[in-house]
């Protein structure tokens, strides 16, 4: 069976021009124009997807099969090209019958051309083949356009679905162009409207809890540059100005507030003799607020000192992936569950914006894992957000799972985040010592997001930083009142 790609090569049909015309028409469609105006960040992401569309269209045209009738006509045309004029005259009746049987668009015109000329000359032979070739080119071009039109409809339908999804999630997950591009890539999965409403729901909840959102942003920015001092430095001299009492007689230079009784102004001293103002006098004396004369009796001089030269290398700490462990015990249900899920959604937003990875582990009696920044990140996020917190608390298993993950090369610079109320049993000694080793030797950092004010200090002492977000009723009312 003849392929369309082979036919295009044989007839010198330019498929690239047809593909470019189709893509330009697609990008100029009213649906995309409105979408680009509403979500400018996603415009660049969709434009970056054009090479993939172009390659998919090329592959579709390359693999497409030519209809049997057109294949047979092309084969007949190729054989006719090899015939001399006398041979062509002999084969002409059979060629005309074949064209008629195949319902070729060239059949009627070919018969009219032959009937209009009583003698078949070499020039007529050449003209017949040229017009036949033009007819085949028109048929091949039409076939290309039909296939591209089918692909355009399918591609437009796919793009519209992804635009709907990305448009809904862009305000929630896309903080910059990088995040918008990754969001567009993740929108390629087969998702229904009811599925991604989980993300919309928790995005709205996160907006209602600005303190929780700020907490996630602070945690995301927590790995800043640090200075590393060098101890093998030499001494250097430096000059500084020091203030010393002057040897010249003092002179009145103005007024000041102090507790210097010897230099009190007469009005201040007069209040001491009034019974009603006596306590006021002593109060101002204690607070050094009595008006006194300011005397000029100090001078500055230059002093030469020595100090070690300390060079500092400013080592920008890489912002690595997030490994987030979420407590799914019964005590983390209700409002705690909403806050934990919304916090993970905020970390996902940060990971998309900064091109980082975000790996979620739910710990109770077993470990469930989700990667929110991968190609299937939206589907993984939906599955995570639809989970219910009804298990037990096994914090030791959580730490063991984190430490196992940190051993791999791709997670060597990850930050571990544990979200819990930390109402649990103490950690085993082997877990505690292993965590301290990771902190000391490999510079891994462990963050705690405490959802309760009653977490056990013995457990939380192991973390490098504790981010507190009390979900108690009193704290919730105070936050609402401050807003």
From Swiss-Prot:
Localization terms from the record: Cytoplasm
Keywords linked to the UniProt accession: Chaperone, Cytoplasm
Pfam families per record: VWA_CoxE
KW Cell wall biogenesis/degradation (keyword) present: no
InterPro entries in the cross-refs: Uncharacterised_CoxE, Uncharacterised_ViaA, VWF_A, vWFA_dom_sf
GO CC terms: cytosol
Main location: cytoplasm
SUPFAM superfamilies: vWA-like (SSF53300)
Job description of the protein: Component of the RavA-ViaA chaperone complex, which may act on the membrane to optimize the function of some of the respiratory chains. ViaA stimulates the ATPase activity of RavA.
Similarity field: Belongs to the ViaA family.
Record text on subunit structure and interactions: Homodimer. Interacts with RavA.
Official protein name in the record: Regulatory protein ViaA
